[in-house]
Regions:
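Alpha-helix N-cap/helix-start motif at helix boundaries, enriched for small hydrophobics
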Residues: 107, 199-200, 207-216, 222, ...
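Conserved tyrosine-mediated DNA breakage-rejoining catalytic core shared by Y-recombinases
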Residues: 215-309
């Protein structure tokens, strides 16, 4: 069947096509993972409910003619339906402008897929009349997104470096007769501070996307960077890129030392150990108990074993029980905590802390200013066109300086000339 060739669309429910679409677009084995699939599934489910009059204003009766008692089918879809849904998104739910645009794009992408699959004869959702009720662009400029400034980057990295140094020194200088549990508590504090330092330095200087670095619960392929993925000698790190393939990212000099000292302190039992494991006590307690039970340990023995450790993370290290990596949400929580303790001055309308993506954007600004768009695009793993678009505020400012310099050099009015008038 060629694209645009109609199926027997009257026999096809919208919901069944949505499931097929999500399988095609999903990531991971069986098409059951990925943020896109999750977000699209939510919005397409809302669209199907709206089409059947199960969602919407009280006087909304759905897209099926009033004299017919059945579920909506593709025969009921045309550009007027998508226009009405665009109006519903724009006015009935109080969504922000860019959110309305995003939600409509999920519906439009499904509509395009339906054309290719032969469910629909035309891409009704992309017609001008259908999109007319959508709000205009919210006017957000490329430079409006948070980017760590040099002062913020230095303040945060200096803060986490001092914390890690103090914690490691406190642990390594303990007297030999220190109580074993107290020594474990000191080691745990040193490990946590060293992990936080390594995470901040990686986010600040590598420009790697936080989603490429840490675990995404909705995408089984994004399990977080492991020690086997890192070569400190070569200064490289293998990450699963946004473009859905493995690629090497650079580790610049400022990142090497924090990672090396952190690894020495942790001494991971295997190379498959996550570089940034979770320190969440509830998660680790459940993991340790389940793993030891699977190994045949009795509940009483598990309890006794756990009582010998100040923290379950230390037990996991000794017993080679691999914890999960922290998630992207976990990284945000860490940076919120560190931004507060570092007392960093932050003036941004959306974030009152140094958000993970701001580290990448801050490094992007450094690279664009120092080496231009081509080099920055390679380091950021983006197209040069996209980098130019996202950092266009830099070029605009520099062109303004060039224009000012040109006016001063060529078009300035000599003081003598003004005196003659």
């Amino acid at each position: 069947m060629t694209p645009g060739t109609p199926r027997n669309s009257s026999d096809q429910s919208l919901a069944s096509s949505v499931e097929r679409y999500l399988q095609d677009k999903g990531k991971g084995r069986g098409g059951d993972g990925g943020n896109y699939r999750r977000n699209a599934a939510r919005e397409l489910e809302r669209f199907v409910e709206w089409a059947a009059a199960d969602r919407g204003a009280d006087d909304w009766t759905g897209i099926v003619p009033d004299d017919v008692d059945r579920e909506p089918t593709f025969d009921d879809l045309d550009e007027r339906v998508f226009r009405e849904y665009a109006r519903h998104l724009s006015g009935d739910r109080g969504l922000k402008q860019n959110t309305v645009q995003t939600y409509y794009r999920y519906i439009s992408a499904w509509c395009g897929w339906c054309v290719n699959e032969g469910y629909l004869e035309a891409h009704y959702a992309q017609r001008a009349s259908a999109m007319a009720p959508l709000p205009e662009d919210d006017g957000r400029k490329p430079g409006d997104q948070q980017a760590w400034t040099s002062e913020q980057r230095h303040a945060l990295t200096r803060h986490v470096d001092e914390r890690a140094r103090d914690a490691v020194e406190a642990y390594t200088t303990l007297p030999e007769d220190t109580d074993p549990l107290d020594k474990q508590r000191a080691r745990y504090a040193a490990l946590k501070a060293a992990r936080d330092r390594a995470l901040v330095f990686v986010l600040a200087y590598t420009a790697v996307r936080v989603g490429e670095l840490l675990r995404d619960p909705n995408d089984p392929r994004r399990r977080g960077v492991r020690w086997e993925d890192i070569s400190l000698d070569d200064g490289s790190m293998d990450v699963y890129r946004k473009k859905q393939q493995w690629d090497a990212a650079s580790l610049p000099d400022p990142v090497i030392s924090p990672l090396r000292s952190y690894r020495q302190l942790m001494d991971p039992p295997t190379e498959r150990w996550p570089v940034f494991p979770t320190f969440d006590q509830r998660t680790l307690a459940e993991l340790v108990q389940d793993e030891l039970a699977d190994r045949g340990e009795r509940p009483e023995a598990i309890t006794e074993c756990r009582e010998e450790y100040a923290r379950d993370l230390l037990l996991a290290l000794d017993e080679e029980i691999r914890p999960p990596s922290i998630t992207t949400d976990g990284a945000r929580s860490i940076l919120q905590r560190l931004s507060e303790t570092a007392e960093i001055d932050i003036d941004h309308p959306k974030h009152d802390y140094l958000a993970p993506h701001g580290g990448r954007r801050g490094m992007g600004e450094v690279l664009v200013r120092a080496f231009g768009y081509t080099v920055a695009a390679r380091y950021l793993d983006n197209s040069e066109e996209m980098v130019r678009e996202r950092y266009s505020h830099i070029e605009a400012g520099e062109l303004g300086n060039v224009a000012t310099e040109a006016l001063n050099e060529i078009d300035s009015i000599p003081a003598d000339d003004t005196d003659r008038n």
